[in-house]
Amino acid sequence: MRLLYGIRAHHDKIWSVSSHQKLPLLATGSSDKTSAIFRLSETEKFPRVTTLDDTHTRSIRSVMFKPPIDDTVVDENELLDPPTLAMGSFDAKLSVWQAELPQDNDEDMDQEPREIWKQERKVVERAAQWELMAVIEGHEHEVKAVAWNCHGSLVASCSRDKTIWIWETDPDTLEEFECISVLTEHQQDVKHVIWHPTQNLLASSSYDDTICIYRQEYDDDDWGCAAVLNGHQGTVWCSAFEHPKSPSASETTVRLVSASDDLTVRIWSTSKEGSETNHDALPSSIKSSNEMQWDQECILPSAHTYPVYSVVWSSVSGRIASAGADGKIAVYKQTDGVWEIEGVTSAAHGVHEINTLAWSKLDDNREVLVSGGDDGYVNVWE
């Protein structure tokens, strides 16, 4: 990999980074109690768009952009779905922020059907103000991760209190967040949660060395644990689903990659038919059970010498990247069904640990890998 740019984002640890699915925006969460948003433009040297602060009293441990409401091509005259960011903090609270779309008073607006394009340009060029939409309370201890589902209607949060909360909202208004489920499967601190990119399937990673998979019960709207993935011999710090659009994805299989204190990165899989929640299409013998069969598919080639904190799966290239306490970033590629290490970058943040990774796209549509470390830097890699 080649380092494109190092962004001095914070003066304290960076715990989390998240890239917007459509706009060239990157958000960070830091021990300095703030989140910064940057424009992913190499030609402009990755300028800061805004800093979100004065909301949390302790470290911001997790940030995640909400997926756009409609991920299809829209009419040019329709309004942009405003970028929306969720944060989780060690102060046990969540917050949700949204960019206020600038009003365009150009006289030629009616003659130029480029409303969305104009709004996008202003949002990423620091013309938009960011508004605090909600502060969400419920957890008893530090929030370790937040995640939006693919529809932007559910937010999952996990905590040191060993619980996972699922919050429901109207993605159009974000007026209120109602807790619809509290999941208590884990026996220890829950480190991470992530939704499947196209299904309401949730994965959680924990200090108890396991990964739990959740979905709604077949007979009602309650959420329940559908599978417990055992195999790691240490804390599971992070997991990521493979996107169905990934070049390596199978039409019949759903896969998940996980990273752990045991120095390993593992891939797990289940049948796609068993993961989908179309109850009417299932045989009556299966409808009565919410259980799923997940198997460990493989352990990726060894690349790390200390705990692995972050793992991400590219929907564009199908590559997996991992990073952690040893300061290394490893990139893996699957060829003819076999996973190989494509490259390892050592001392990617000098002597500092790496806490977070994200696959992102620049404003010129190039895919890059973004890393955040204890040094307060966001590094952009190609």
Curated annotation (Swiss-Prot):
It is found in: Cytoplasm; Nucleus. GO terms for cellular component: cytosolic [4Fe-4S] assembly targeting complex; nucleus. It comes from the Eukaryota. The keyword Repeat applies. Keywords: Cytoplasm, Nucleus, Repeat, WD repeat. InterPro entries: CIAO1/Cia1, G-protein_beta_WD-40_rep, WD40/YVTN_repeat-like_dom_sf, WD40_repeat_dom_sf, WD40_rpt. Disulfide bonds: none annotated. SMART domains: WD40. One of its GO terms (biological process) is iron-sulfur cluster assembly. WD repeats lie at residues 9-48, 55-107, 138-178, 185-224, 231-278, 303-342, 349-382. Belongs to the WD repeat CIA1 family. Essential component of the cytosolic iron-sulfur (Fe/S) protein assembly machinery. Required for the maturation of extramitochondrial Fe/S proteins. HAMAP family: ciao1. Interacts with NAR1. This is Probable cytosolic iron-sulfur protein assembly protein 1. It comes from Meyerozyma guilliermondii (strain ATCC 6260 / CBS 566 / DSM 6381 / JCM 1539 / NBRC 10279 / NRRL Y-324) (Yeast).
